[in-house]
Design a protein with these regions (language model features):
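Bacterial Sec-dependent N-terminal signal peptides
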Residues: 1-23
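Alpha-helical cap/lid subdomain in secreted, periplasmic
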Residues: 3, 79-224, 228, 232-250, ...
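N-terminal, helix-rich and Lys/Arg-enriched segments in bacterial and organellar proteins
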Residues: 6, 28-35, 51, 137-139, ...
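Intrinsically disordered, low-complexity boundary segments flanking structured domains
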Residues: 13-14, 48-52, 177
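Serine-esterase "nucleophile elbow" of acetyl-processing enzymes
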Residues: 20-65, 81-93
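Acidic/histidine-rich helix-loop elements
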Residues: 35-44, 65-74, 107-116, 219
Length: 259
């Protein structure tokens, strides 16, 4: 009898270990454009809040993004430490920062948020990559979604694409360029959501974008439909990179846009 109980116990332990090994976990870190929000308190929704809907049940999305955080403040406040404490070997970490790094116009801000692109911002991106890998995780850069800064010709302005530089050929204050540079140097996959969201809203048009994608009074944050659309773009970006491809759902009945 004792032997039977031991066999059942061993089987349960083995099953638990097997299920745990099959589980895929995706950690997302970033700012308010990615964060979760309390329903019925605001129209704002972050795309990270919708991200789980685009994966099969084998994948768990854990969203750590918080409003007002930059690459610097997220790290310095101890939020990154909480992510690391929960990180397991093989986990994915999606890293998206820039909106609040820009707060001081490309300088290191006294409030701990603003970062100079090619020095402070770059160094924090490198920290996230290095520390993720040291724990057996897989870092992925996600360039920031565009701000709803339309120009007269119907395109999103350079500033809306997180390039604060004055001259067109100047990359001194181009946060997306810095992220891509670090990605190349550290061999990190990049999902270019700056490009994909830019193309998306330019094709949709300014009027529909204001009504359906972003909070109408806000050029930075998305409402529910916009967050869902952007989450889908993020999932598509991963699929194109052959990352988590077999776990990504298609034709998710979540989005309804009037074009």
């Amino acid at each position: 009898m004792k032997r039977k109980y031991w066999s059942l116990g061993a089987l349960w332990i083995y099953s638990t270990i097997l299920l745990s090994a099959q589980e895929v976990r995706v950690h997302t870190i970033g700012d308010s454009t990615m964060a979760d929000y309390v329903e019925n308190t605001t129209r704002t929704r972050g795309w990270g809040e919708m991200f789980q809907e685009f994966f099969y049940p084998e994948v768990e999305v854990i969203n750590y993004a918080r409003g007002g955080r930059s690459s610097r403040s997220f790290y310095q406040e101890g939020r990154w430490e909480k992510v690391k404490n929960n990180l397991r070997k093989g986990d994915y970490v999606l890293i998206q920062f820039a909106h609040n790094d820009e707060k001081e116009g490309g300088k290191d801000g006294a409030d701990g948020r603003g970062t100079a692109p090619w020095t402070t911002y770059k160094s924090y991106l490198e920290k996230y990559v290095d520390e993720t890998r040291s724990l057996g995780g897989k870092p992925i850069f996600v360039t920031p979604i565009v701000r709803r800064y339309f120009q007269k010709d119907g395109t999103i302005s350079p500033k809306g694409c997180h390039d604060l530089s004055i001259a067109p050929d100047d990359s001194t204050l181009n946060y997306v360029r810095v992220m891509k540079y670090v990605a190349q140097e550290w061999h990190v996959p990049v999902v270019d959501m700056t490009a994909s969201t830019k193309a998306f809203v330019e094709q949709l048009g300014e009027t529909a974008t204001v009504k359906q994608i972003y909070v109408p009074t806000d050029g930075t944050h998305t409402q529910a439909t916009g967050a869902a659309c952007y989450a889908e773009l993020a999932a598509e970006g991963l699929r194109e990179k052959d990352i988590l491809k077999k776990y990504i759902r298609t034709n998710v009945p979540l989005i309804s846009i009037v074009r």
